Amino acid sequence: MLQHTKSAELFEKAKQFIPGGVNSPVRAFKSVGGTPIYMAKGRGAYLTDVDGNSYLDYVGSWGPFILGSMHPRITAALEYTLKNIGTSFGTPIEMEIEIAELLCKIVPSLEMVRMVNSGTEATMSAVRLARGYTGRDKIIKFEGCYHGHGDSFLIKAGSGALTLGAPDSPGVTKGTALDTLNATYNDIESVKLLVEENKNNIAAIIIEPVAGNTGVIPAKPGFLADLRNLCDQNGIVLIFDEVMCGFRVALGGAQSLYGVTPDLTTMGKIIGGGLPVGAFGGKRKIMERVAPLGDVYQAGTLSGNPLALTAGLETLKILMDENPYPELERKAAILEAGFRDNMQKLGLNFVQNRVGSMACLFFTETPVESYASAITADIRKYGKYFHSMLEQGIYLAPSQFEAMFTSSMHTDEDLDKTIKANFNALQIACS
């Protein structure tokens, strides 16, 4: 068995100074049991922990590492910026214009864009902007969709909130909750009903076009187009939260994959290349309401800092130069087929959902199309599965309700190893 002595010691020490011993709840292994693994190094598709154990990484820092960890072009660009430019000035820099222009070129909905420091900042800012633009207060989100830890979004949220078994959080006021309406993912009638019941009061509908924090749930054919039409008919701002799926499922994000253009888009993860970053953008007539041009306030001390922009710019350039998407699709499809074959051999019929290089194996036989069906998954079995995979050197998300990310650095040999480990882990999970 792998030894995790130093990780256990570090976790005990961390709990003295950090709430729960972690800086993000899902990292605490509450959902799967056991002690969090402390990582010491990441290279390519591999992580090494503080006890010297090596793992194939399918978490990818929760999505940013589509090119693997420590890509040589990105590290070289960061080294140049550190040595020759600096870390932050609190002033405009030329690089801000370069990345903004590139994002507007790549993402269909973007005519103007504002850089921020996280996905949460991006979604909070986009919702504030939608409210300012429309003069309305209420928003519609979808049960299980996670849009960061802003108060407006912690109502039937996904990801860590699902892991805790508490979809909302103390500290979110009743007034805030009343302004956040929840619809059922992939159910347009549930959205229409809320719009009708709150006529002329809905500022925005915000959605993950590929839900990635309730496992992975793709939008059904026509669902996003129906939302687009509904928003057009009712003067509602349509926001695509592409913090996770943006630049992951396609270069132009899910909106280019599905051919539906929102009014506003939020981004993060991949556009930071592993450093903290976020962005929101969209139609010029809406974005012109953002201060200092308009009256909707948004600001950030470190927004647009050279380090984060360097990593993001180089990542985008590599994605454009190398077009890894066909190869990512091939690799992710190999894993999906391998897992399916394993389940057939074992007489299992668990659900797999996948869009491009983001996927999820749900420990349920119920088709997963919404929050309600996602939570039929057996988290006890997932916990056993997770620890068996970990023991075999495969690092997955320590939660049933997160995505598995394939990167361009995963080799065919890595995929074979993962499929073999999956066969063993499925047997243990179901024993």
Swiss-Prot record:
The keyword Cytoplasm applies. Gene3D superfamilies: Aspartate Aminotransferase, domain 1 (3.90.1150.10), Type I PLP-dependent aspartate aminotransferase-like (Major domain) (3.40.640.10). It is found in: Cytoplasm. It is an enzyme of class 5 (isomerase). Its main location: cytoplasm. GO terms for cellular component: cytoplasm. It holds the Pfam family Aminotran_3. Keywords: Chlorophyll biosynthesis, Cytoplasm, Isomerase, Porphyrin biosynthesis, Pyridoxal phosphate. It catalyses: (S)-4-amino-5-oxopentanoate = 5-aminolevulinate. GO terms for molecular function: glutamate-1-semialdehyde 2,1-aminomutase activity; pyridoxal phosphate binding; transaminase activity. InterPro entries: 4pyrrol_synth_GluAld_NH2Trfase (IPR004639), Aminotrans_3 (IPR005814), Aminotrans_3_PPA_site (IPR049704), PyrdxlP-dep_Trfase (IPR015424), PyrdxlP-dep_Trfase_major (IPR015421), PyrdxlP-dep_Trfase_small (IPR015422). The keyword Disulfide bond does not apply. Pathway: Porphyrin-containing compound metabolism; protoporphyrin-IX biosynthesis; 5-aminolevulinate from L-glutamyl-tRNA(Glu): step 2/2; Porphyrin-containing compound metabolism; chlorophyll biosynthesis. Disulfide bonds: none annotated. Its EC number is 5.4.3.8. The modification N6-(pyridoxal phosphate)lysine is found at residue 269. GO terms for biological process: chlorophyll biosynthetic process; protoporphyrinogen IX biosynthetic process. Homodimer. PANTHER family: GLUTAMATE-1-SEMIALDEHYDE 2,1-AMINOMUTASE, GLUTAMATE-1-SEMIALDEHYDE 2,1-AMINOMUTASE 1, CHLOROPLASTIC-RELATED. Belongs to the class-III pyridoxal-phosphate-dependent aminotransferase family. HemL subfamily. This is Glutamate-1-semialdehyde 2,1-aminomutase. The gene is hemL.
